[in-house]
Amino acid sequence: MLLYDLLLHLLSPLLLLLTLIDAKRRGGGFAFIRERFGFFKRSPANPRLWFHAASIGEVQLALPLIAAFSSKGVLLTCNTPEAFRLAKKQLSADVEVHFCPLDFSGAVNRLLSHYQPSALFVVETELWPRLFAEAHRRRIGIFIINGRIGHKTSASPRFIKKLYRQALAQVTYVWAREPIDQQRFIALGCPEERISSVGDIKLSRPENAGLPTSPLLSTPYSLAISTHHDEEQRIARAWMAAGKPNLLVIIPRHPPRAANIAKELADKGLICHRRSESPIPPKSTDVYLVDTVGEVANFCAHSEFVFVGGSLVPVGGHNVMEPAMLGKAVLTGPHTITQGSAVDYLSENNAIAIATKEDELASLWQRLSTDNAWRQQLEASAKRAIDKLPDRVQIYREQISRVID
């Protein structure tokens, strides 16, 4: 751990620079810089429970759990400005939402002293050695929710694996996503008696059925969500090859990229407008870029179909269950390793279309745009698949209730 602390301090100028860049580029502001180094301006509300959800995906998973325990006093920390904005928009005002400090001893201890939580719930895969060590030293229970360990983490260098082992030694309990994740946690050093496989919270029957009301657009559109660099151009090419069947709406994974995306697509001769500048796109618009936060569900619900990004580039995919739970036809690319269980489940139920290469993306885009019967078949299959899911959110609520009561 001493070597880890020394390395962090040696890297502190670089980490400060990266934090400053992120604050400016991603709209975090001064609060992002201050809190990432453990300085919290507001007086402590003494929340009992601390949830940590690194980015947008983890925040979305945590929202129903946080809502269930908000009366007990909840602090939610995030790593990114986008996740912070989503949490502030979706959660009630009595939930404290802040940025998580970097893993410096001083920064971590300032947060722990400021809020004095009794339990820490980490969503998915955030194993921070210093944070876990300091929380354990203060006898704060550490729990991992929907624990996931990917192949890359399992194949980490020996030095990194040693740090993971040290972090996992401090963990009170891990609720793993799947048996394979449970095995990987154990291989990294998690004691067998402190882990069980509870199921993937993403594969949980939604509690509030029905589509969001009041569509944000009056014109038909196809939708691409959670896109990454280079995906927007590939999607636009597929959409053009399909004959520009309707308006193309793109919601990038990181909204601050929208200006650059608009320029890149405009250079290809496409007319682009951003939602932050044009709440209603002009009729001449080819591509409408949604650079706002908290509107994905509405755009999904009223789209013709939904392409889920992070899958045309080796990111590993994003949450294909979100549009499926809204009864939409779902299209994805080949890179879905982080969403394997969800993609497999929808595939087994004939509720997803997968483009294995770029020219196939164009043909599937065209078919989804023109073959109403096939699109409706995918929608019906998605609804049936979702109806069969267990209520894993409730299972996790029960697990959390047992350890805090």
PLM regions and their residue ranges:
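Nucleotide-activated sugar donor-binding and catalytic core shared by glycosyltransferases
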Residues: 1-405
